[in-house]
Amino acid sequence: MAHWIDIAFCVGCNYQPRAASLAATLREAYPDATVTLTPTGGGRFELSVDGTLVFSKEALGRHLVPGEALALLTRQLSH
């Protein structure tokens, strides 16, 4: 089953380079998944898998740490 991974990022905060870098990493790790970038605002940086939010900068008050996105996706996709 192919999965859908979405990265929502704040344009005004200049999070696009961070989102694009993460998208490239995720496309390499999950070549069968569809990885999309969704421009938003309000300081958001969110990672969703198949419609389920797995990371929210707003909720946690921080950005992803290195390796965290892959760990979150591995955990979510193993269910």
Predicted regions and their residues:
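Domain-level signature for proteins that mediate thiol-based redox and metal-cofactor handling
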Residues: 1-79
